[in-house]
């Protein structure tokens, strides 16, 4: 759809990014898109994950109003209530004022009730504008970057985590059970598997649907 492509181009051409996490194998290719970017600082992608560090960046969330935009919103709220059980280092998930917006998704072709992608994006922007927050953590597919840019334009802070955001709240996913994924991220091959042995971690079974297998072979479940 040419009109859809033009619309997406308009959304994504905004130069709002300050820091960009990349796989080391991809970094040499970034020169092809750099003319369209705002000269962000490149960092290894795994450094976005607070639980890989003994001094996690997420410690600065303490006492803040933190908005999380994710399809598993309700489960994130429940898991946060047991935050002290999820990680050995309490700085990974400190105490803060958690607020959530359930992200709109059309996983594998599931209908979401919106006329098109742009209407769904605007809905989530409106929900953000109605919420009082200091920093926004985002994991909702192709909507993530535009929503993070929207937060920045509103004078807020935002981090587009992508899929790994669920791990911050002790939610397992099959993607991270593959040792090759950890190696690709520059981590020990059993890094995620060790996290998953914690009995406080759960699977998002309640969010499975008929289309889940179409999403990278149900990688988030």
What does each of the following model-derived ranges do?
Residues 146-221:
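C-terminal functional extensions of proteins
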Residues 6, 119-132, 143-145:
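A short, acidic, amphipathic alpha-helical segment used as a generic capping/interface helix at domain edges
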Residues 13-72:
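Extended, H/D-rich, highly charged conserved domains that either
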Residues 33-44, 99-123:
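Glycine-rich phosphate-binding "P-loop"
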Residues 69-113:
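Redox- and metal-dependent alpha/beta enzyme cores, enriched for Fe-S-associated oxidoreductases
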Residues 25-28, 71-75, 137-146, 162-166:
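Gly/Ser/Thr-rich loops at beta-strand to alpha-helix junctions
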Residues 35-46, 88, 149-164:
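A short, gly/pro- and small-residue-rich
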Residues 1-12:
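Single conserved hydrophobic/aromatic residue that forms the stacking wall/gate
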């Amino acid at each position: 759809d040419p009109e859809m492509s033009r619309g997406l181009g308009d959304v994504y051409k905004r130069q709002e990014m300050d820091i960009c996490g990349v796989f080391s194998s991809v970094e040499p290719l970034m020169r092809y898109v750099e003319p369209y970017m705002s000269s962000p600082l490149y960092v290894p992608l795994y450094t976005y994950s607070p639980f890989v560090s003994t001094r996690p960046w997420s410690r600065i969330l303490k006492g803040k109003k933190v908005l999380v935009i994710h399809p598993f919103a309700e489960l994130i709220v429940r898991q946060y209530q047991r935050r002290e059980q999820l990680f050995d280092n309490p700085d990974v998930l400190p105490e803060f004022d958690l607020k959530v917006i359930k992200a709109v998704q059309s996983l594998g072709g599931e209908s979401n009730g919106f006329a098109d992608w742009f209407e769904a994006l605007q809905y989530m922007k409106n929900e953000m504008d109605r919420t009082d927050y200091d920093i926004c953590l985002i994991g909702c597919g192709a909507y993530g970057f535009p929503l993070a840019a929207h937060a920045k334009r509103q004078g807020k802070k935002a981090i587009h985590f992508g899929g790994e955001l669920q791990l911050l709240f002790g939610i397992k996913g099959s993607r991270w059970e593959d040792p090759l994924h950890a190696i690709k991220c520059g981590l020990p091959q059993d890094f995620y598997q060790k996290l998953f042995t914690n009995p406080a971690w759960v699977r998002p079974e309640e969010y499975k649907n008929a289309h889940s297998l179409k999403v990278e072979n149900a990688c988030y479940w």
